[in-house]
Amino acid sequence: MPKVALLNQTGTQVGDIELADAVFGIEPNEAVVYDAIVMQQASRRQGTHDTKGRSEVRGGGRKPWKQKGTGRARQGSIRSPQWVGGGTVFGPTPRSYAYKLPKKVRRLALRSALSSKVANNEFIVLEGLTIDAPKTKDMISVFAALSIERKVLVVTADYNETVVLSTRNIPGVTVVDAAGVNVLDLVAHDKVIFTKDAVARVEEVLA
């Protein structure tokens, strides 16, 4: 079982915490992690692109010149695709790019990302995270005590509005609850901070 230090908000070690092997101690599967990231990014695409076909472009109802006798190539509409200003052939239309990998694959990707963070010493567990009032400087003090200077993902057991409001003005900081942990956020941040209760929630679902 992987064991990591259990810290308080001042950065002092108050004990150790053993993490579930099945969640935090597996051999990371990079291919599955990649597939999960592509799935998430595809789901975030707007898909609002649109082009007009020959039936949608304004004009072109009249035949530009008679069929025979001009010596020119026959044409039926100035909005045919070969004309400048004509319709687009097989152009993009609004669509959803979202798709879902099988649940087992998604969970394997999440376990792989978590295990990778633990193996690379990028995983921090706090005994608790309590902020009395929404104050950015209080969260900055916590990060300073934990020697965190770069992008960090904070995971709480439940939605914590005070923590969310205290971090929203700090660049590179993302806060999610245990149910919202995802592969893209884990990979995109240099450090991950879990509260002790959040670890228990994640293990309950993924173990």
Curated annotation (Swiss-Prot):
It holds the Pfam family Ribosomal_L4. Residues 47-59 have a biased composition (Basic and acidic residues). GO terms for molecular function: rRNA binding; structural constituent of ribosome. Residues 43-85 are annotated as: Disordered. GO terms for cellular component: ribonucleoprotein complex; ribosome. GO terms for biological process: translation. It comes from the Bacteria. Residues 60-71 have a biased composition (Basic residues). Keywords: Ribonucleoprotein, Ribosomal protein, RNA-binding, rRNA-binding. InterPro entries: Ribosomal_uL4, Ribosomal_uL4-like, Ribosomal_uL4_dom_sf. Belongs to the universal ribosomal protein uL4 family. One of the primary rRNA binding proteins, this protein initially binds near the 5'-end of the 23S rRNA. It is important during the early stages of 50S assembly. It makes multiple contacts with different domains of the 23S rRNA in the assembled 50S subunit and ribosome. Forms part of the polypeptide exit tunnel. Part of the 50S ribosomal subunit. This is Large ribosomal subunit protein uL4. It comes from Exiguobacterium sibiricum (strain DSM 17290 / CCUG 55495 / CIP 109462 / JCM 13490 / 255-15).
